[in-house]
Structures are given as structure tokens and as C-alpha cells.
Amino acid sequence: MRFIKVFLFVLTGIILPVCLSAQTVSGKLIDENSQPLPYANVVLLSLPDSVFVSGTISSEDGTFTLEATSVNQIVKISSIGYKTVCKAVSPVNLGIVQLVSDAQMLGEVVVEGNLPVTRMKGDAMVTSVENSVLSKVGSANDVLTKIPGITKKQDAFEVFGKGTPLIYINGRKLHDLSELEQLNSDDIKSVEVIRNPGSRYDATVKAVVRIQTVKRQGDGFGFNLRSSYYQSDNTDLIEQANFNYRHNNLDIFGSVYYNQMESWQDFTLQLEERGTKVWNHDMKSYGEFYSKMLSGNIGFNYQLNDNHAFGMKYKSGKTLNERNPLSKETNINVDNVFYDNIKVHSCDNYYYDPDHELNAYYNGQLGEVNVDFNADYLQNGKSSNSLFQEISQTSENRDVHSVNNVKNRLVAGKLTLSIPLGGGTFAIGSEVTYTHRNDDYINEENYVPASYSKIEELNATGYAEYNRSFPWGDWSLGLRYEHVKFDYYEDGRHIDEQSRTFDNFFPNISFSTQLGKVQAQLSYTAKTQRPTYSELSNNVFYSDRFTLQKGNPTLRPTIIHDLTLSGAWRFLQMSLSYSQTKDWILNWGELVNEDASLTMLSQRNWDKSIPMFTAFLSASPKIGCWAPMMSVGMQKQWLTIDYFKESKNLDNPIFTASFNNTWELPLGFMLGLDSYIQSAGATQNIYSEKPNGYVNVSVRKSFLNDALSVELRGNDILKTNRMSYSMYSGDYYLYQKSVWDRQEFAVTVRYKFNTAKSKYKGTGAGDSQKSRM
């Protein structure tokens, strides 16, 4: 609390003097189609000698603010492809400023595939995609794999040293990563990576990826089609169709998406539990996964005038068929003496309710106040029926039937107000989210007791942020307050000891500057990581006759303090981070019986603060038709745990390296060769035993002036994308080695006609709670 008081005192000391002495020049930039114009250069010059006083860049919504120290000054506004505009600083509110195209300048712009430029802008590393080689690599999925600092692991992306990011497209938060496959790379304008998000974002968010799309011109109807065929040991299919109709200020859009996926996993597992006896399990397992999913969305955006826009988007989807058959055989020894051999055949069948997701937004300018409001509703549910058939060599056989029903509902609203203040921008906002979850588990044979649980959570947030540019750098200060009320019910009864209330403050501060051609930023943030709703469930799940699984309703949120230094120079980007993590949530195995014959897998908070250091360096030069992107990274933690009554140090660093290459060739051909490798090392109480990685190759050919494209791709051609790791936890040890059918050949055909990207500006609310579902 003392730190919070000092922080507020410093914040007041910075804001108050500038409010008393400065006049704020503000305005909003638009293009010829009345669309906001971001990234334009806005500089304040003194008269009559035109000496530079201060400068800034217009934000995503086209707004800008500057501090004028005299009426004898002018504002100069410039952007590539537009005529430069100069305005007097009187009146200080310049209102709407429209920039018109400069035909001569546009004629000189090279629009062939050039090197994607990564620069630092505010709190983000921004990579330009439009008119670069990245615009031709396929989908947004393919683009993100080539962005410095982003790595794709299995079916998710990670920002190095920060974990899984929130991903936004035009300010709208992604809840389904399949949308990245639906977004064509040539529709992307830029990708921004924020490694230390400020108070505007939920305190659980440790990294953000913002994708901005190209704003298409003109009215009319457009569509784009995509069909993909993937052949590994199984066959996967993706079919999609997007449409857009635009007339004057009305924009109507929608899409239909179908995904059919089959896969397998072959893994070996070794378990050891030590109680009064020592149990060893050697398991070989083979599992398959089948899924078919159909989804669609429709929405509209209406631009009332230059200052007001509103819209709505509805999305629905349903998994048509999903099942997971599994076969495994386990040899069990007790004190090095044979105990049993058990063969298991199981199958999980999943039945999904249709998902419903609705977002409505309003974005407007009321005088000098920018208003951004979002409201969200989300509903989903699923039921799983599981059958385990256990055949024992020395004990009784078992048939185990279980049913798990889960239903989620969420309502959220978010409001942000931004105003010019003291030569900078002051933003204040609030977000309220209500979540309701039912989770029932029933075991017909009563090997584990039936449970009927309910979770209700109210998250109320207030935040404030101040940004100001000086000739020597940019400051940003913010503070976020979060009130979380968590109520847990079991069998219809409120469980007081597992229901809690949290009140936390999360400050952030950052400073950005430019020294010659070097851009640098130093930032501090306080973050949290809340347990998922399944981790909070007290339901007990049957894994086998020796192992049960459940959540832990007593879990506390993790608190993270992070200090990050980022820099950029020409084609080089660098990041250094140091963090302290308190109450880290670890997967943990505990003995139920003293003789270790039964183990419960759950989660726990680590009661000591864990320090971590990460370093990252990337380079993206251009050599003729060759555009390489090379990166190296290191992550090291300092963690010691109790393991089999002894201390186990898990401080081995993890090293990563990637080398992505793109060659642009004549006749519309483009070649790609991407590789990634990760060393052995420790993360939390898990140690990766062996290096793993992949090599992907691709060739793309465009036709009909790029309206039609065909891509051939080979993924994991060396079949090295596999995993082997150990988990250490008290009296329980697990080793797993997994192989997937990720080596595959793919063909993708895309066709587009008069495409126009949606102008939808909804950003969503309750994002972190949606992710926890």
C-alpha cells in the first residue's frame, strides 16, 4: 500500500504542473474516405524559423495531442501517400483534419514485396506487413510465425518470455484462434507486439498482439474463398467463405467456416510415487482425436459521421462431432516387484451446445472526449460421456462410466473515456464482468463421488492512464484497480471457506525515447494470473484405478512484477526482462494413501517468490530477393523444490533459435524455409529433457493479378516436432515422451473478388474471463 501511495504522489506531481502551464493542441485525422488515419507524423514548429518544438504520431483512431507553448506556432501533419497539411495552433482544438492523396507521391511508392520493417511505436514493436513479403505468406497464422519474438508451439502462439498473448484484430479480441486461418495475409496492414501491457488491459494479460487490417476503398460486394487440404497419416480439411457489402456509411460482413481434423498422439509415460512403498508405472499409450466444427458470424458497422460509429457482431458455432479413443498398457511394480499389468480401452465422446457470442460497440468523439464502449454476451456448454474398460492381469476388471456437463454464461461491459490534458492524453475507464459456470460430474459405478458445483464471479475494474510526449521522450503512467468476488457452490450449498474476495492495485509506468537511430523503452508492470475455472473446480475425475484428478478451489491468483527494456536499431530488435512471481500455480501430484497406491493430480500455489530473466535478440535484414529473419532467446528461472525428501534445483536455462527465410522470385513465385529449435531446460516444476523443433518449407504461385493463389507446404519435414519432459512434485514424479502426426503436406487455394475488410471497431469486454472458460 505504501508503494501505491508513492506511485499516486509521483503521478500527481507529473500531471499537475503541466495542467497548470500548458495549452493542449488536439485533433483527429481522417483520410478521403472519412476513415481514421493512424501513424501520421504530427509536429509542432515555431515561427518564423520553423524550429522543431515537439512531435507525436496519431493513434489508431486518428487522434493526436500536443502541448503548445505559444500562439506563434504551427502544426505540420504528414503521412506517406498524402499531401502535407499545416495548421495554426489557434484554436487549440483543430477538430477533424482530412488528408488527401498525393498522386505524385503515390506514383513514386514502390508497392512490390519489400522488407517488413519493425519499429518501436509507443508501447509496441510494430511490424509493417502491407506491401511486404509477409503479405504473401498465406494467412495470419503464417504471418505471426515470422514476427520477431513470436513463436508457435503446438496450436498456440507465445511471446518469448511472456507466454500466451491476447490477440486482437482491429481492436476486437480473438476467442477462437481459427479466425487467424480465416484472415488472409494480404489483408493485414501491421502487427503490433506489446510485451508489457498497461492499465487498459486486464491485469492477467502479460503480452498483447494487435493485428491491424488494410482499409479497402469503395462500395459494393466482395468475397474471398479459401480451401485447404492437409495430408499426414490422416486427412484434415478447412473450407471458408467471407463476404462484405459496403454502401456509403454502412458496412455488412459475415463468414462461414468449416474445419475437419483428425490426429493421433503416441506417448510413453513413466510414473514413480514414494510413500511407505515405492510404486513404478511404465505406460505405453496411443490416442486418436476426431473433430468436425462449423461456425459463422454476421455483423454490421455504421459510420454515422466522422465522430460517431456503432455496430454489432453475432457469432455462433457448433462442434458437430468430437471423440477421443485411447488405448494404453501399463506395467506396475511395487518395491521392484511385479504388481499388475493393466490394459485400458477408453473413449471420450463430446457433445457441444451451439456457442453464442454477441458484441455491440459505440465509438465516438463528444467534443474533446473520445468515448469507447463495448458490451458482450457469451454462452456455451458441452457434455462428455466417457467409458474406461480396464482389463487387469491380477485384479478385477473394471468398466467405468462417467458424464461431465459444463455450461458457461458471461455478461460484460467496458467503457473508456480519453481527453487531452496538459499536453498529453488522460484516459479513465471501467470494466464489469459477471460469470456463471455449472460443472457436474457423475460416475455411474461410484468409484469417485458425484459432484455438482457452481461458480459465480463478479469482476469490477477501474483504471486510469496518462500519456505525454516530451522532446526527449514519451512517458506513460497507469493504475488499475480490480475487485473480484468469487462464490463457490457445491450440491447447491455456498461453501464459505472456498469463496473469496480479492482487491488489488496494478500500477504500470514506461518511458520511451530515441537516441539517434536507436529506439528504446523501459517499462514496469504488475500483473496477475488467475486460475482457470476448471482449475477451481472441486470435481474429482477418474483417470485410472491408481490416479484421480481434480481442481483446487483454494488457489490464489499469481502476482507478477515485471521490468522490461526493449530496443530497436535498423533491422535489429532486442528485449531484456526481469520478473518476480509470487504464488505461481504449479501442477502437482499428492499421495492420497500413505503407501502411494492412489495419487491425486491437482494444482497448488508455490509459496515462494520465483525470479526469472529473459533475453531476446532478432535481426531481419534484406539481401536482394532474400528476406531472412533470425532470432535467439534465453529464459532462466531460479526455483528449488522438494522432491522425494530432497531439494531439486530447476534453474537450467532454456535457449531458443529461429531462422525464417522468404525468397521472392519472378513470375509470381515465392519460396519459404522456416526452422525453429528449443533446447532442454526448466519452466516451473517441469523440465524439458530433449531439444525439439521443426523445419517447414513452402512454395506459392499467384495468378490473375494475385486474385488467385495456390500454395504448397510441407510441415515438420524432418519429423522433429516432439516433446519429452519430466514433472517433479514432492513424492510424485512423471516422465512423458510424446510424438504427434505433425509431419504433413498441405495445399491451399485462395480466390478473392472485390474484397473489402470490415470497418468493425468493437474491442470486446470480459476478455480474460472468456479465456478462463
Regions found by a protein language model. Name each.
Residues 43-45, 78-82, 94-133, 153-154, ...:
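Short, acidic, small-residue-rich periplasmic hinge/interaction motif at the N-terminus
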Residues 48-63:
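Short, acidic Ser/Thr/Gly-rich low-complexity loop/linker segments typical of extracellular
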Residues 67, 146, 172-198:
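Short acidic/polar hinge/loop motifs at secondary-structure boundaries
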Residues 92-98, 108, 140-143, 177-178, ...:
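N-terminal periplasmic accessory domains that precede
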Residues 212-227, 266, 282, 294-298, 381, 485-488, 516-563, 576-597, ...:
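Surface-exposed extracellular loop regions of Gram-negative outer-membrane beta-barrel proteins
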Residues 295-321, 342, 346-491, 514, ...:
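Face-selective signature of the C-terminal outer-membrane beta-barrel domain
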Residues 347, 454-457, 497-500, 528-582, ...:
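Outer-membrane beta-barrel signature, preferentially recognizing the C-terminal barrel domain
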